[in-house]
């Protein structure tokens, strides 16, 4: 059966697949690449059947563009008007259709994984895209469209990207090689060492002289620490953190520590309380003997004055002091 002519496809569905229709539209372009809107326009202008139910077949066509390796996506340059990327045929799918007929497709074009890993394949694809870009530029120049000047590096699709000289501040190289600095601007190694919790041997004399001025009753006028024999310690007596490993003593036979602990001073004797007046015993002496149980004790206290010790120890005197106060 002979193939029907193009003009007989008026309202009938054409015998072309979506892949054939897309390839036909791309091959008809001088630049060999078209945006998606131009592909739609070509199909609807050529085949009236696709002027209806556009949403259904356009979704199917987009699905074929995305999931078939025979189509490649080319990003649009920033200086080009419009939106959306361009679609082109893969350079290796030239023999996909038998004898150049879009009605017969030999087999499904598939890019092997080894082709993705081969170094020559990306270079061939980049060279093809560069040629297509040059063809498009020449076509635009022939039509008189003015394009802004772009650097040559923008069209160098096959070149190898140069490594950037910028290094992230948190990269592992910068973290390892960075010299940590304090907020004041000084390096950490230039800071003064932190004093240890225990005094070093060369600080004992200074501490002793300062303590001697504050505790004269312990150290005397000249200071006990100044008259003591100087302490000689080796480097093994102290650890790396300044903590003494041996007890600090003046000599082998002495038990007095190098920094004496202040001794609590002996409290002075409490002065005796003065003799209390006896107005209450006078009142009690005037009362009857039956009502004053302490009349005998009152007479004794009036005849002989009480000593300070008796005043503190006698219960009767304690009662008198409470009554007076």
Curated annotation (Swiss-Prot):
Matching Pfam families, A to Z? Forkhead
Bias type Low complexity, positions: 284-309
Knockout mutant characteristics: Mutants suffer perinatal degeneration of the medial and most of the lateral mammillary nuclei, as well as of the mammillothalamic bundle. Mutants show no deficits in hippocampal-dependent tasks as contextual fear conditioning and social transmission of food preference. They have a highly specific memory deficit, restricted to the performance of spatial working memory tasks with no impairment of spatial reference memory. Female mutants have lactation defects with mammary glands with incomplete lobuloavelor development and morphological defects in the inferior colliculi of the midbrain.
Q: What is its main location?
A: nucleus
* UniProt cross-references to SUPFAM superfamilies, sorted A to Z: Winged helix' DNA-binding domain (SSF46785)
GO cellular component, alphabetical, reads: nucleus
GO MF terms here are: DNA-binding transcription factor activity; sequence-specific DNA binding; sequence-specific double-stranded DNA binding
User: Where does this protein bind DNA?
Assistant: 12-103
Region of interest (Disordered), ranges = 284-325
Q: Which GO terms describe its biological process?
A: axon target recognition; cell migration in diencephalon; epithelial cell differentiation involved in mammary gland alveolus development; floor plate development; hypothalamus cell migration; inferior colliculus development; lactation; mammary gland lobule development
Cross-referenced InterPro entries? Fork_head_dom (IPR001766), FOX_domain-containing (IPR050211), FOXB1_B2_FH (IPR047389), TF_fork_head_CS_1 (IPR018122), TF_fork_head_CS_2 (IPR030456), WH-like_DNA-bd_sf (IPR036388), WH_DNA-bd_sf (IPR036390)
Entry annotated with the keyword Transcription: yes
Q: Kindly state which keywords UniProt assigns to this record, in alphabetical order.
A: DNA-binding, Nucleus, Transcription, Transcription regulation
Query: What tissue expression does the UniProt record report for this protein?
Result: Expressed widespread in the early developing ventricular zone of the neural tube and later restricted to areas of the spinal cord, hindbrain, thalamus and hypothalamus. Expressed in epithelial cells of developing and adult mammary glands.
Q: Which Gene3D superfamilies match?
A: Winged helix-like DNA-binding domain superfamily/Winged helix DNA-binding domain
Q: Where in the cell is it found?
A: Nucleus
The free-text function statement in the UniProt record for this protein reads: Transcription factor expressed by neural progenitor cells in specific regions of the embryonic neuroepithelium. Essential for the mammillary nuclei maintenance. Negatively regulates the proliferation of oligodendrocyte progenitors and promotes oligodendrocyte maturation. Also expressed in mammary glands, plays a role in lactation, controls development of mammary glands and the inferior colliculi of the midbrain in the central nervous system that regulates the milk-ejection reflex.
Which protein are we looking at? Forkhead box protein B1
- The record lists the organism as Mus musculus
């Amino acid at each position: 059966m002979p193939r029907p002519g193009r003009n007989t496809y008026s309202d009938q569905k054409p015998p072309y697949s979506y892949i054939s229709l897309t390839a036909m539209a791309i091959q008809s372009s001088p630049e060999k690449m078209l945006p998606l809107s131009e592909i739609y326009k070509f199909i609807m202008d050529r085949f009236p059947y696709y002027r209806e139910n556009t949403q259904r077949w356009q979704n199917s066509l987009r699905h074929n563009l995305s999931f078939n390796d025979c189509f490649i996506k080319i990003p649009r340059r920033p200086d080009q008007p419009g939106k959306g990327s361009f679609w082109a045929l893969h350079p290796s799918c030239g023999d996909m259709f038998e004898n150049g007929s879009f009605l017969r497709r030999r087999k499904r074009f598939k890019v092997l994984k080894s082709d993705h890993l081969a170094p020559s394949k990306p270079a061939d694809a980049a060279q093809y895209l560069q040629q297509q870009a040059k063809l498009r530029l020449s076509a635009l120049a022939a039509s008189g469209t003015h394009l802004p000047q772009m650097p040559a590096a923008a069209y160098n699709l096959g070149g190898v990207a140069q490594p950037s000289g910028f290094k992230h501040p948190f990269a592992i190289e910068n973290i390892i090689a960075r010299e940590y600095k304090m907020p004041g601007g000084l390096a950490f190694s230039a800071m003064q060492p932190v004093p240890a919790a225990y005094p070093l041997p060369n600080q004992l004399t200074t501490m002793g002289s300062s303590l001697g001025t504050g505790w004269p009753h312990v150290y005397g006028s000249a200071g006990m620490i100044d008259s003591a024999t100087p302490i000689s310690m080796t480097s093994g007596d102290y650890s790396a953190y300044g903590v003494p490993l041996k007890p600090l003593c003046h000599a082998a036979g002495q038990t007095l520590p190098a920094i004496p602990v202040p001794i609590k001073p002996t409290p002075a004797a409490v002065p005796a309380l003065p003799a209390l007046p006896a107005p209450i015993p006078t009142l009690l002496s005037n009362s009857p003997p039956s009502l004053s149980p302490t009349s005998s004790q009152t007479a004794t206290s009036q005849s002989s004055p009480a000593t300070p010790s008796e005043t503190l120890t006698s219960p009767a005197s304690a009662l008198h002091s409470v009554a007076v106060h």
